[in-house]
């Protein structure tokens, strides 16, 4: 082996170790992202990022600026990994088109779709109407919150939420902390003509829809 081959062999060894460590680092970044989503913490922490880069490179005697550039690139990729796991939540009244919009949007941006009502129906083996009629709204809301936690932890989905998911206070920081919230504010005249199947709280017709809209509109707006 000549001198050049020796240099290259050493670089190969270092690169192999770097690849292993990068994989480990990015896996940990995913776990940190999950923790942030579940605890409502922001992905961005610019001050800490500056401190991290400075601390990792301050003792270098050569190529410090190159190392700074590499660390900044690694941090950018780590944040991208975490952002890719953010959900896109669609919220709004029953009949506002959340499920249909979620499916279309998921296809457009190539992300999987999650529909909290459908997940509940599949798990319980009952329609939403049957769950309400058999077990009551409080039971449904508890199951809905559990379902939301699972969706938030998995991340990376376009999520069609149930119309009343934001009426449970503990759900709000989970949704806001684990993704982007979009309010589908459909015209009230369209909502009045929405189908009532699996929408037990609007089975009362026009008055029920108007009452529900008045009760929820500000919460939808504040969360989006």
Regions found by a protein language model. Name each.
Residues 115-173:
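ATP-dependent small-molecule kinase phosphotransfer cores
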Residues 1-86:
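Domain-level signature for soluble enzymes in the chorismate/prephenate branch of the shikimate pathway
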Residues 93:
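P-loop (Walker A) phosphate-binding loop of NTP-binding proteins
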Residues 177-219:
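A glycine- and Lys/Arg-enriched "phosphate-lid" helix/loop adjacent to the NTP-binding pocket
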Residues 90:
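Hydrophobic anchor at the beta1->P-loop junction of P-loop NTPases
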Residues 99:
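Walker A/P-loop
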Residues 155, 178-179, 223-224:
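Short, well-ordered alpha-helix to beta-strand connector turns
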């Amino acid at each position: 082996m000549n001198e050049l081959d020796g240099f290259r062999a050493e670089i190969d060894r270092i690169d192999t170790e770097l690849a292993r460590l990068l994989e480990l680092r990015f896996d940990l970044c995913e776990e940190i992202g999950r923790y942030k989503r579940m605890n409502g913490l922001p992905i961005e922490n610019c001050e800490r990022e500056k401190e991290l880069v400075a601390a990792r490179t301050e003792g270098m005697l050569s190529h410090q600026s190159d190392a700074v550039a590499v660390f900044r690139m690694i941090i950018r990729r780590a944040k991208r990994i975490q952002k890719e796991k953010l959900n896109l939540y669609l919220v709004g009244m029953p009949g506002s088109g959340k499920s249909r919009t979620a499916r279309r949007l998921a296809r457009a941006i190539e992300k999987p779709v999650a529909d909290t009502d459908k997940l509940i129906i599949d798990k319980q083996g009952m329609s939403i109407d049957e769950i309400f009629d058999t077990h009551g709204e409080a039971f449904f809301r508890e199951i809905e919150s559990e379902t939301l936690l699972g969706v938030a932890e998995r991340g990376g989905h376009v999520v069609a939420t149930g119309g009343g998911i934001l009426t449970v206070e503990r759900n709000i920081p989970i949704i806001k902390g684990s993704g982007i919230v979009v309010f589908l504010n459909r015209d009230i005249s369209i909502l009045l003509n929405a189908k009532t199947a699996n929408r037990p709280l609007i089975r009362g017709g026009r008055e029920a829809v108007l009452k529900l809209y008045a009760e929820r509109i500000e919460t939808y707006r504040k969360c989006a």
